[in-house]
């Protein structure tokens, strides 16, 4: 009776993907992962506020935690949810895209932090608040396996839910490639090659 339409308890999978992509863009492309590392490599200099402190190598645990939380709690958790929903609805293209996004997040985290949690990382709702860490080498193997699954999903002939919006006037469900599966497959292969160089 008193249901707030602006607070859904279950988000349709089509609407998870734009949220995943937007939060990935912020965490990977516009936050600590890029700003701090580029300041430290002297590609540019921090001259004001937080960037000034980072330019003086004064980084706090909050700065690092922000990146960690922005990847695990947002896009990666949503990727797990999207993969599950896509598999339930026979929509392997959505599952494949979510797996490419998951692999991208994992690759970013392991490149920055080395050993990270994955197998137990999404069990917080089940009470596991201290997931086991896996070695960076194992994470690269996991990334490769996830991307293999993604490629198989993206090559699937059967897909119950289209990646494109029904009305061309609506914003796309896929902000990155607008539902172009071939581009997602190419991205998966490119990521496989990129992370194979780290093994």
Residue spans for each PLM region:
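Structured, solvent-exposed acidic/aromatic patches
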Residues: 10-14, 45-199
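Membrane-proximal, proline-rich intrinsically disordered regions
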Residues: 1-51, 55-58, 70
